[in-house]
């Protein structure tokens, strides 16, 4: 999958832009705060109908404007052209059209235009709470498996309903029994698929970390779930119900799962240096790309947002050699330093385009 053209109106700091991209390498250069990340976020929005930066929709519409528009012209691996048109109005439902036909449900779009982004904000994957790591697993699985996406939506809907009931003065145990049984069914599917995903993902991640770091450091991932002991969630929820009534929320379930990230058998967030954390993160995201490529119908678009800062020259060279090789499709790279991008371009024989970003304006 590649994007050939992107047209932007009133998205964040970008008032208007018309971009035509290389099918291989696209380099964006500009100082911080000029709009490089906003352009990448527009690409992310077209794939996932939300910002990579987890900001609400009303914050992506340019200040003082009523609506933002994003239009992308794509070409899939069979050679077919596809137009996406997304309109965003504060306080309104987003409207997404594919070849002029509106999606009835935005969830039907997820996974059809695969994209992987590596950015400084991804540090929360290592340093943040467990919800960040669950989101990583969910994003990957939702792109590949519509049944997983459906199970996750239903589980979260029932979880919200249970939490509402836990806050009520009147306790309806019969209704709670039914609700927990339904949650147990969805949770079993979610847990099983998360577990299998990590089993498939781990060898790919290990190989990439070794390639980038050039060291024998042992890294690993460990999936932890309340369901790991084989007790159905409905039974766990029934047992925890008295405590949950006191707490006012559901204290167990797959919404509490954890993905432990380990360096030498110890949580990397406790011992990792800045360089080790960044190498771990980039390896995770490139493994996400590889896994999506292996299990999906289309090669994802890869966005690399200011990833070379805090890395030594040897690791930068290894990453460049890795993503510049066969198997990676269309790539977008941002940097504040034109010299860095020139060195990257010089090391590749691929077709490329260079864009300069200044105050929300894009020059080619």
UniProtKB/Swiss-Prot annotation:
Compartment(s): Cytoplasm
Cytoplasm listed as a keyword: yes
UniProt xrefs under SUPFAM superfamilies: P-loop containing nucleoside triphosphate hydrolases
InterPro entries for the chain: DNA-binding_RecF, DNA-binding_RecF_CS, P-loop_NTPase, RecF/RecN/SMC_N, RecF_2
Signal peptide (from-to): none
Binding-site residues for ATP, renumbered to this chain: 30-37
Location, primary (coarse class): cytoplasm
UniProt keywords, alphabetically: ATP-binding, Cytoplasm, DNA damage, DNA repair, DNA replication, DNA-binding, Nucleotide-binding, SOS response
Entry GO MF terms: ATP binding; single-stranded DNA binding
Record-level GO BP terms: DNA replication; DNA synthesis involved in DNA repair; double-strand break repair; SOS response
Gene Ontology CC annotation, any one: cytoplasm
PROSITE patterns: RECF_1, RECF_2
Transmembrane segments: none
Main function: The RecF protein is involved in DNA metabolism; it is required for DNA replication and normal SOS inducibility. RecF binds preferentially to single-stranded, linear DNA. It also seems to bind ATP.
Assigned protein family: Belongs to the RecF family.
Annotated protein name in UniProt: DNA replication and repair protein RecF
Originating species: Porphyromonas gingivalis (strain ATCC BAA-308 / W83)
Source taxonomy: Bacteria, Pseudomonadati, Bacteroidota, Bacteroidia, Bacteroidales
Gene designation per UniProt: recF
